[in-house]
Swiss-Prot record:
Active site location: D128
Record bears the keyword Nucleus: yes
Role summary: Protein kinase involved in blue light responses (e.g. hypocotyl elongation and flowering) by phosphorylating CRY2 to reduce its stability.
Description of the deletion phenotype: Hypersensitivity to blue light (BL) leading to shortened hypocotyls in BL.
Annotated ATP binding sites: I15, G16, G17, G18, S19, F20, G21, E22, I23, K38
Similarity field: Belongs to the protein kinase superfamily. CK1 Ser/Thr protein kinase family. Casein kinase I subfamily.
Protein name: Casein kinase 1-like protein 3
Bias-annotated ranges (Polar residues): 303-314, 373-415
Length: 415
């Protein structure tokens, strides 16, 4: 029997789940738009969908913030209907061999900083900055970075007085241990500086391929958190950022100079990375590492199919949109190929070369989110394999165990 959510969304297949509940594809019965539906039992011990829906309403209209289509109670469950988005940066990181080029990291960093700044401008902290919570868009918004999962978000300004929340200590760790700030590990109340420090760890994770505190053995979660804390605090910034541009060390040093209630200079941090981008001669052409890999695979697959009829490429990108299309028949493969051809004018088998001709002006003086006003193309996510979630995943601070975002079907195991 078909299940209709909110009177107009026909529930489809399950694409993910976690301690909060489950995530499904759904189709609008009239427009056939494909959306994502997050469902939780209304009697759950720690319901979060109502709070999350409230946050999305507050952030509504911001670039890179998913739109809420509907929220309400459906029988015995709470349901949140949202824009369907593409793969997470964690998915794409794995797809690209667990390392991103500096060019890709810098293009992502600019948008990620803008997302965090926007959330802060609305008076909230995210408190769970990690690769799994940044998703790429689909179709014409495939180059736009989205920030999701506000289940752990918290106001840092009093709604009535607009005063900053008071400094506190002895707080439980809230967020994901791998990317948590040093102060968060030490039990200090989080503020804007902590979201930014977490972003720094995400960027280094992308550049390095891993962080020094991954893979630590422990008998339980507390011991693991303690070991991560000890390793993180004892690792000098210069060691963490060794063999990478000095701007990344400067980023961390700046974060560590911020006082508890100080407003970060987001523009300074973006200029730091934009100047590096310009100095390296990169062009802001939205050709990410995965764009090139997808293009190369498309070319290889095309050549193989010409040589052997019926052959196919066994390695699927997490943004494959061959199934469950809800809008125009737009192939991500063709889209990626076109971007590579038109932007770089490169040959049929491009290599990942992130340099442009000397003196070329990068595209930072143009809006980063140049596609934000274009119509969205509703496409389905690809890989929906469930993976185990390890002890470094999000912790809400009240001991409820692991908690994942609404795209948990894309989650990779913590190491």
């Amino acid at each position: 029997m078909e299940r209709i959510i909110g009177g107009k969304y026909k529930l489809g297949r399950k694409i993910g789940g976690g301690s909060f509940g489950e995530i499904f594809l759904a189709t609008h019965v009239d427009t056939f738009e494909i959306v994502a539906v997050k469902i939780e039992n209304s009697k759950t011990k720690h319901p979060q969908l109502l709070y999350e829906a409230k946050l999305y309403r507050i952030l509504e209209g911001g670039s890179g913030i998913p739109r809420i289509k509907w929220f309400g109670v459906d029988g015995t469950e709470n349901a949140l209907v949202m824009d369907l988005l593409g793969p997470s940066l964690e998915d794409l990181f794995v797809y690209c061999g667990r390392k991103f080029s500096p060019k890709t990291v810098l293009m992502l960093a600019d948008q990620m900083l803008t997302r965090i700044e926007f959330v802060h401008s609305k008076g909230y902290l995210h408190r769970d900055i990690k690769p799994d919570n940044f998703l790429m868009g689909l179709g014409r918004k495939a180059n736009q970075v989205y920030l999701i999962d506000f289940g752990l978000a918290k106001r840092y300004r009093d709604a009535n007085t607009n005063r900053h929340i008071p400094y506190r200590e002895n707080k439980n760790l809230t967020g994901t241990a791998r990317y948590a700030s040093c102060n968060t590990h030490l039990g200090i109340e989080q503020s804007r500086r902590d979201d930014l420090e977490s972003l720094g760890y995400v960027l280094l994770y992308f550049l390095r391929g891993s962080l020094p505190w991954q893979g630590l053995k422990a008998v339980d979660k507390k011991q693991k958190y303690d070991k991560i804390c000890e390793k993180k605090i004892s690792t000098p910034i210069e060691v963490l950022c060794k063999n990478h541009p000095v701007e990344f060390a400067s980023y961390f040093h700046y974060c560590h100079t911020l006082t508890f209630d100080q407003r970060p200079d987001y523009g300074f941090l973006k200029r730091l990375f934009r100047d590096l981008f310009s100095r390296e001669g990169y062009e802001f052409d939205y050709i990410f590492d995965w764009t090139i890999i997808k293009y190369q695979q498309a070319q290889k697959s095309r050549n193989q199919s010409q040589a052997v009829p019926g052959s196919s490429n066994p390695r699927a990108m997490p943004v494959d949109t061959s199934n469950h299309r809800g809008g125009p028949n737009i192939s991500y493969e063709a889209e990626a190929s076109e971007r590579v051809r038109s932007a770089n004018a490169i040959g049929p088998s491009p290599q990942i070369n992130n340099n442009t001709a000397a003196g070329r002006t990068p595209g930072f003086d143009h809006p980063v989110h140049k596609n934000m006003n274009m119509p969205s193309t509703s496409l389905s996510p690809a890989g929906t394999s469930k993976r185990n979630v390890g002890p470094e995943t999000s912790n809400s601070g009240y001991g409820s165990g692991n908690r994942t975002g609404w795209t948990s079907s894309f989650m990779s195991p913590e190491k």
